[in-house]
Every structure is written in C-alpha cells, then in structure tokens.
Amino acid sequence: MARRPRHSIYSSDDDEEDVEMYDHDYDGLLPKAGKRHLGKTRWTREEDEKLKKLVEQNGTEDWKVIASFLPNRTDVQCQHRWQKVLNPELIKGPWTKEEDQRVIELVQKYGPKRWSVIAKHLKGRIGKQCRERWHNHLNPEVKKTSWTEEEDRIIYQAHKRLGNRWAEIAKLLPGRTDNAIKNHWNSTMRRKVEQEGYLQESSKAGLPSATTGFQKSSHLMAFAHNPPAGPLPGAGQAPLGSDYPYYHIAEPQNVPGQIPYPVALHVNIVNVPQPAAAAIQRHYNDEDPEKEKRIKELELLLMSTENELKGQQALPTQNHTANYPGWHSTTVADNTRTSGDNAPVSCLGEHHHCTPSPPVDHGCLPEESASPARCMIVHQSNILDNVKNLLEFAETLQLIDSFLNTSSNHENLNLDNPALTSTPVCGHKMSVTTPFHRDQPFKTQKENHVFRTPAIKRSILESSPRTPTPFKNALAAQEIKYGPLKMLPQTPTHLVEDLQDVIKQESEESAIVAGLHESGPPLLKKIKQEVESPTDKAGNFFCSNHWEGENLNTQLFTHASTMEDVPNLLTSSILKMPVSEEEGSFHKAFAVPRNRPLASPMQHLNNAWESASCGKTEDQMALTDQARKYMAAFPTRTLVM
C-alpha cells in the first residue's frame, strides 16, 4: 500500500481532492480512440459542452449515468469538472470581507485541512478556492514581506537537492507557502541563478545555512485535536470555536516560560543547534535513502542526552556564582540566563530540582515524528564533552574544597597577616582559602572574587575525607606564640654553597674511619646518641660554638690511611664492648692538619635562617617529636646481615 504523501502546513495541495482539473485547458493530451483511459487527460471543449447538456438533462444526482455517456471519463471526474469549473453558480470573482471573515471562523472551527466541509458553508466557493484564499492571504503565519538573501539561499540549496518539490522546500521556510516559493523561483530566482550566477559562490556553505530559518521564525501556530479543559495562557488570539481551537502566538519575545501544549511542532529540548535543525529537515525528506539510519541515531541520542538535559537546568536556590566561562553553555529551562561572566553553576548531583518537560500531544505531530526520540535532537559530541568536563571539574572542586576548608579544630585563622610560608605572599589582601559559610550568611568579597573557590553544594562533598592539616595547625600555633610573622629578606646564598662544599669535602675524607677504629668503646655511645636524637645532634653540629670565633680555622678531620686498615664495623667485636665514659679520644678522631683552609670564611648565621635550616621551628620540632615517638615504639634488635 503506497504511503500518502505528507504536505507542508502551508501547502496549497488539497488533501481531499485527488483530481485537479483546469478551467478550459483544451490544448492538452487527447485520449486515444478505442481504449478507455482513466488517466488525468485534459478536458476538451466538446466534452465540456456535452457534460453541460447531460447535467441539464439528468441533474447532479447520479454521476454514473452521466459518465456512461462520456467515454474515458469516470463519475468522479465528471463531478469534479462540473463542481469546480463548469457550474454556473460557482463564484470566480474577488473575495469579500464577509467571506474572508467566514473562512477565518471556519478554519478555527474545523482546522486548515477540511476544505470540502468549509466550502459547504460558503455558497459559490469550492474547497480549492477556500484553501488558496487561506494560505495565500488570510493565514497570519504567511509572510508577506520581501524575500531575503538568506531565504533565497535556502531555496537555491533545496532546489538543487529536491528539484521542483515545492511542498518539501516549503518545510524549510516557515511562513512561506509552496505556491509563493514556486512563483518566486520561476519569476525571479531562476533567471538570476542561471544567467547572473546568483548565490553560486555561497553554495559551498551547504544546506546547514538553511537551518537559520527555524531560529528566525517569528510565529508559532498550533491546532489541538482535543479541546483543552481551560484557556491556555500566552495565546495571542482566543479561539472563536469550541470544536477545533486555534492558537496564535505573535512574537517569540512575548511567549511565556511555558509554551501552550497543543503546538504543531513539539521539540522537547532545551536548545537545538543548527546541525540538529538540519537533521529535522532531512528527516522529513521522503526520498532520503539514509532516513531510517538517522532515525535510529536520533533514538540513541535521546537515551544518552535525556539526563544531561535535566542536569543543565540550574537550581533556583543557588546563590553562589563563579567566574568560569566554560560553564556558559548551561541553559536554564525557563529561559532565564545570567549574563557573561556569572553563569550559574549547575548541581550535578541533584536532579529533583529539574523542571519536567510539558507533555507531548502526539496527535499534532507528523506520523514519523510522534515518538519522543525524534523530537529531542541534540549535538552528541558537544553533550558528551560537556558531561566529561563537568564531572572532572566537580571532582577537582571537591578535592580543593575538602583540603582548604577543613582542619582538626575548625579554627578561624587570621589571614590578614599570614604566617611565613615558602610561597611569597602578595602585597594586597586576598582570601587564601575559602571562608566557611555554614552558620553565617554569604558575604560578597569583590576584591577577592577571582581568587575564591567556587561554592558547591555541600551534599556533593559529604562523602569526602576530612583529614586535619598539620601545617595549618603549626602556622596557627606559631602565630599564637610569636605573633604574626613578617616576610624577611632572603638569606645570602653563598653560605649555603659554602656549607655544601664543606660537607662534600668532609664526606670524601676517609680518615674518620681510622679514627673511629682507634677510639674504641666511645663509638657505640655516640651511635646510640645519634639514633635517639638525630635532629638535635645535627643542629648542634651545624650551630655549635665550634663554628664561631677562633675555632673557625680548625680542621676537624685527619688524613685517612689505606682502606685495608679499616675493619668491618658490623662484624667487629667493638659493638659488644661496654660503653666508656671517656670523650677525649672520640674528639681526637676528627682532628686534621691545620694547614688546610676552608673553602671560604664562614659568616655568622641569621637566627631565622638557622631556625629554619637546623630544625628549630615549631613545626619541625613537632615532626621530630612524632618521629622519635614512632621509632621508640619499636624494640631494639641486632642487625643481621
């Protein structure tokens, strides 16, 4: 069974009239004798005269009897020829205001398809006349303005692909009828395109430019199959009839947040990009061989994008805004959108705030677009990229917020004078961490707005770990004990270089091994003391009085003997000897000749630098105590190789 062709909403083709006859078109094809042709051959003058006489003799009750006297004609053809062309009561003159008003009322009552029923209420008019009068003159959706270059480009591209299928081309131009498009092409565009090269250079842009016709459509028209229970808000024109109400919305800026449900095209999406609009037009193409493939793709897109569209709707109670341009694509369902740099941050974890989409009246849709999958079309790659970026960004904010906003005692630090850190502090005041907003109202910090972490719903961060930050505790304790610290000038770097040279030279000396071998029992005591307090010994080694005054030129190490004389300390019996209280022999092991100068003369150390480098700050001492307690928890044991 052949499918019935779909027509444009502005099409002038009559759906109920299968045979179109023309008035006195006697120059057409003539039927061959000897055969009964039932095709759409043109009527001759002789056939028209004979039909008039037969109607005068037999009347208009039985058209089969009349058709029996006309070879090659059926009863339907005879009836249509009489009613549409030859009937003397047929009015072919101009339309009056009363007739136009009557047509408008009947269209609102019966809809823009039942033209035969409408014609019965207008004496002397047939359905074809009423249909053409409505679409060409009375329909408020039909544009009567001049043709734009954009519309010409759409017609040119569509005509290259579809040919003279004006009803299909009319679907790409809302507000233009197929008859108007055909007349514009034949009278103006074809000559300009073929002779003057009009639109030839811009043809490379392709058909996606035709999709702008949907975005610039200034009207919406709808016909509800079932009358609603109450009046719908936002209708520009109230229905005059009760059987088939008609709603007209004049301009898109006057449309409220919720569009009335009985609309002709239910596109149940937040935002339709241009490629999606082009896919809608290709979907309605009967001759498109890839139509079924695209339908399946659209159904898959529905499943993958339904949750994302819900997630893009911003929460109405969200007061915190952030300066992130990457989130500007978030679209609010009620057409309320903030400007520029302050796009609302969508909550990805709560979907119960999302507004459900209005129900779809499938009766208003074409037969192939009744399913919701064909009504929701989005750009797949953009949606998937946005979902991935939003999830990664939310995870990053979760880690940053949990690190900066938590501490062991939840104390409020004085950030006007921050403690000494390894990172230089800016000269002006700024918020280093995100302030708490649990029990106090939100305060706008204009000067620190760029540096603040964006606010996020606490419900997302409930499962995040809340580990105390020892470094923040150390800074707070240091401020309480010593007061706010100030930035000190940088310590000269040559002292550090000298220390590194001395340490390198001392590490290369092998005389210490021989001295340790001669020292005997005191070595075990020194090793034990170094194990118990390594930080204190290191501090005493670098910061003791041996580095000051007259002892600066004293060499601490002696030249080493050969490596063959060095015993193995791990296997030697020296570890088993009792500890001696004598200290003198141990210091002798570090004596070196005095004729060997240092790399450079040492200078007096800065107290602050000495504290930081020798482990005397509060946080370093605290870490040392923790390490000592940790090591003391394990019993001592003999090292076995």
From Swiss-Prot:
Single GO BP term: positive regulation of transcription by RNA polymerase II
Domain named HTH myb-type: residues: 35-86, 87-142, 143-193
CDD domains: SANT (cd00167)
DNA-binding region(s) from the entry: 63-86, 115-138, 166-189
Keyword field: Activator, DNA-binding, Nucleus, Proto-oncogene, Repeat, Transcription, Transcription regulation
Tagged with keyword Oxidoreductase: no
Location of the region described as Leucine-zipper in the Swiss-Prot/TrEMBL record: 376-397
Domain commentary: Comprised of 3 domains; an N-terminal DNA-binding domain, a centrally located transcriptional activation domain and a C-terminal domain involved in transcriptional repression.
PANTHER family: MYB PROTEIN-RELATED, MYB-LIKE DNA-BINDING PROTEIN BAS1
Stated name of the protein: Transcriptional activator Myb
Organism listed in the record: Gallus gallus
Lineage: Eukaryota, Metazoa, Chordata, Craniata, Vertebrata
Gene: MYB
